[in-house]
């Protein structure tokens, strides 16, 4: 199956359309971004009804802030890992630690902000088993990749693209160049999950913040930790 990838920003967050027979959207950006989202649809000549699934890589407000409004517009189902259900239905925030110098310095400031977003009940609760995307005409699956948060997930395509949320950063204020995240609940788990993605043939990384980059960046950081 042939797929097309469209990247766009909703606030500081990098979101993506994976276009097959239908469209799967990765992350829903900051709160109050519905009008910008409509402009993105218009610019790319996308019928909102083609978007059938919104995959939330995790429950932080900058990744799920406009999910409820976008679901209302498109009729798409929202999928999130079951361990983060409370975070989007209520007001629980999973706070990761700073894992390098920049992360430790900025973490208290970044996570002192608690921007409200419309709470919602997701339609699909992912577990630790892969969730295939074949019903949308896309050769790929959603897999559980905990580390940034306990319920973080990634979307991997058979063609080598990996949409990883905050398993990687590539943009201000997080990193000035691509690489491993500067915040994580368990950086060891992130590194192990990167090994899984590499073993599964990942060639290109689509992060939750910043532009896509080749997997060689991550391979080098795993091999030479001092470069992180």
Per-segment meaning from a language model:
Residues 35, 59, 64-66, 150, ...:
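Short N-terminal helix/helix-N-cap motif within the alpha/beta-hydrolase-1
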Residues 24-26, 55, 78, 161-163, ...:
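Residue-level marker for buried hydrophobic side chains located in beta-strands
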Residues 94-99, 181, 223-225:
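Short, hinge-like loop/turn segments at secondary-structure boundaries
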Residues 37-40, 66, 193, 221:
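A general structural detector for well-ordered alpha-helical segments in enzyme core domains, enriched
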Residues 42-125:
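Active-site HxH/HxHxD metal-binding segment of metal-dependent hydrolases
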Residues 31-32, 117-118, 130, 139-146, ...:
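Metallo-beta-lactamase
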Residues 1-44, 154-170:
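Conserved beta-strand hairpin/beta-sheet module of binuclear metal-dependent hydrolase folds
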Residues 8, 18, 129-136:
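Short acidic-hydrophobic surface loop/beta-edge motif
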């Amino acid at each position: 199956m042939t797929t097309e990838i469209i990247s766009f920003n909703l606030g500081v967050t990098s979101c993506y359309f994976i276009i097959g027979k239908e469209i799967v959207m990765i992350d829903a950006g900051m709160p109050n971004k519905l009008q910008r989202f409509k402009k993105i649809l218009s610019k790319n000549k996308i019928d909102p009804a083609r978007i059938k699934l919104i995959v939330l890589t995790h429950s932080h407000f900058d990744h799920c802030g406009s999910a409820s409004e976008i679901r209302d517009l498109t009729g798409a189902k929202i999928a999130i890992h079951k361990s983060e259900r409370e975070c989007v239905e209520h007001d629980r925030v999973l706070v990761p630690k700073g894992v390098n110098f920049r992360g430790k310095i900025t973490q208290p400031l970044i996570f002192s902000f608690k921007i409200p977003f419309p709470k919602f009940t997701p339609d699909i609760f992912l577990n630790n088993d892969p969730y295939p995307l074949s019903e949308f005409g896309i050769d790929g699956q959603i897999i559980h990749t905990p580390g940034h948060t306990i319920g973080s997930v990634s979307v991997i395509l058979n063609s080598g693209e990996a949409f990883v949320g905050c398993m990687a950063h590539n943009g201000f204020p997080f990193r000035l160049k691509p690489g491993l995240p500067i915040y994580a609940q368990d950086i060891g788990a992130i590194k192990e999950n990167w090994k899984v993605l590499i073993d599964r043939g990942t060639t290109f990384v689509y992060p939750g913040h910043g532009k896509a980059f080749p997997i060689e960046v991550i391979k080098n950081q795993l091999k030479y930790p001092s470069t992180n």
